């Protein structure tokens, strides 16, 4: 599943470079042309952030452009604050980013607030759509591309395949508390149970209470 997500990220980034943001004028080499900001999780989490980062690396190295990531500090409730998200977007722009990858719906409001201020920067928001704080009405901004995956379906397939591969003691650990992580976890449990019912075998499931939200 991680490799599949990485492939999707590579394809999305390549698509962006080829047509979505075509016509951008060339500029001097930025400090870091492509910047990914995580949702607070690290890029070796074995989950969503790592998949996204692998995709960013693969594309950037093939294209021969500079890249890096930032891992913001989350609050005590394991969530990334709006203020922190916006500070890291400002930092990325200050460091010369031309493309900012945001692999989580926790950036929806931050992108809504910041993207119009940096119209020469291209934003890629994964599993989210920009909207104002306190208002879920989607906004469409010229320099923002939104890429959505069905997290529930992806989790279901992963759980189903895990049991079909012979695993009967399973666990799920989300990177941080978020809607996407929760949906993926819920799908994982459902897929594992569906496969267990088909095979007629018992399957146990453990999870981290602080992270997984059902």
What are these regions, as identified by a protein language model?
Residues 26-214:
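A residue-level marker of the well-folded mature domains of exported/periplasmic proteins
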Residues 1-33:
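Short, low-complexity disordered leader/linker segments with a strong preference
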């Amino acid at each position: 599943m991680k490799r599949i997500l990485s492939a999707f990220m590579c394809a999305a980034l390549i698509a962006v470079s080829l047509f979505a943001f075509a016509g951008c004028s060339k500029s001097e080499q930025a400090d870091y042309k492509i910047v990914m900001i995580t949702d607070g999780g690290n890029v070796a989490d074995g989950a969503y952030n790592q998949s996204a980062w692998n995709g960013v690396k693969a594309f950037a190295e093939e294209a021969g452009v500079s890249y890096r990531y930032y891992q913001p500090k989350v609050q005590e409730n394991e969530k990334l604050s709006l203020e922190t998200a916006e500070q890291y977007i400002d930092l990325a722009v200050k460091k010369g980013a031309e493309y900012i990858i945001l692999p989580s719906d926790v950036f929806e409001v931050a992108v809504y607030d910041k993207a119009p201020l940096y119209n020469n920067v291209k934003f890629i928001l994964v599993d989210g759509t920009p909207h104002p704080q306190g208002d879920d009405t989607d906004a469409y901004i010229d320099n923002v591309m939104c890429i959505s995956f069905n997290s529930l379906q992806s989790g279901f397939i992963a759980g189903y395949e895990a049991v079909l591969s012979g695993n009967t003691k399973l666990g799920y650990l989300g990177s941080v508390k978020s809607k996407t992580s929760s949906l993926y976890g819920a799908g994982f449990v459902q897929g594992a149970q569906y496969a267990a019912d088909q095979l007629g075998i018992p399957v146990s499931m453990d999870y981290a209470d602080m992270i997984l939200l059902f």
